[in-house]
């Protein structure tokens, strides 16, 4: 199976441009990274970029800092900032149960290590979600979820969602926790998450080229 195109954007504070480009080329040659854009911020605030590789598998161009990139799980940082703003404003606390805010989340059943389905006992808090200790996983962080298509048939799972993998606060697993944080922000603020982030996070930071959906223009 072909590996997906992996594009990494890194910002380094490096004083020497020649060494900077040499370091980038060495990284590209020593790994399976097909394309990379790297930048450095100079002491005067200016930025220099170095690129290597195509913007897509089927193109003969060179990728650059003006290409559009999917930032994927870096949106977790934005969602976390939004939630912590609400904590600062006293609209939610880190440790109160979220059952009333997100009943659909709280009722998600747990799949044990021996593939038994049990009802959750502990409530989920914002702290659990932010620290990835609420029990949610990904297919690439959980062996059970990686084969979920087959496993759910074996155990007779009929729900249209994936189970949690442990009681909140009892373990750690990188997973879909921040998706629920985004829903919590919407619930408390009464705003669409994209609108909230634009008004209170990306807007004030002048991140004017960051969107949920790329504008037509």
Regions found by a protein language model. Name each.
Residues 37-40, 48-49, 72, 128-131, ...:
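Structural recognition of the beta-strand scaffold that forms the well-ordered cores
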Residues 17-18:
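Bacterial signal peptide processing site
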Residues 25-62, 94, 145-148:
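A short, well-structured edge-of-sheet supersecondary motif
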Residues 169-177, 189, 193:
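Short, contiguous, pocket-lining structural segments
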Residues 4-14:
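Sec-dependent N-terminal signal peptides
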Residues 54-173:
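Active-site-proximal loop and beta-strand segments within enzyme catalytic domains
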